[in-house]
Amino acid sequence: MGFYTDVWDDVFFAVVYVREGGVLERQLELLRQAGWKIIEIPCKKIQNSSGSEEASVIVFEAIEFPYEIPRLPDDWIHEYLEDLHWLDLSQGFFFVLKNYDALFQSPHDPHYYMAKWAAQLLQTVDTELRYRYSKDENGEYDPANILYGMEVSQEHLDQVLEYFEGRAIVIPDFDENDPGAEHPLYVKNNDEVLESWKYESK
């Protein structure tokens, strides 16, 4: 079973970093130096959780939620993830799923339910959070410095790419002079897909 089971999933493109390449760690290092807020979700802990409710608590803790965690955390995690008003995101924000491929290794989750659950967190960051922070004080559109990605081992890279049905973008490098810029491969892929949708709608 692949990721794209819902019509709304079509607008999501997974951004993948190969752990052994060291690209992600170097990029995160430079972004931290530039004042970016980095949130890393430990997918091995997600894998070892009892399910999405306990996993949601892990995410609430990772995003430094300052209030009492809701009684039904799985019902609320996306709503708070698209907000994050208690964090300083003024310089930029990077949301990372660490060791994402761990979610494909559980014998108790043959349909990769938790892999999709975790990837949907990235969807919320990409769409809802990015939109919320993409309006300036005059209400004009001003794209926010918001990035997301998942870290995957070389060993399980093909498995993850197959799960995302060829729509994932593997990041080979980044501009060290502008580490917060979206990678040209990601931008090109988005532009091509959006253009194809316009063509199909004619």
Residue ranges and their predicted role:
Residues 2-202:
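Positively charged, polar, low-complexity stretches
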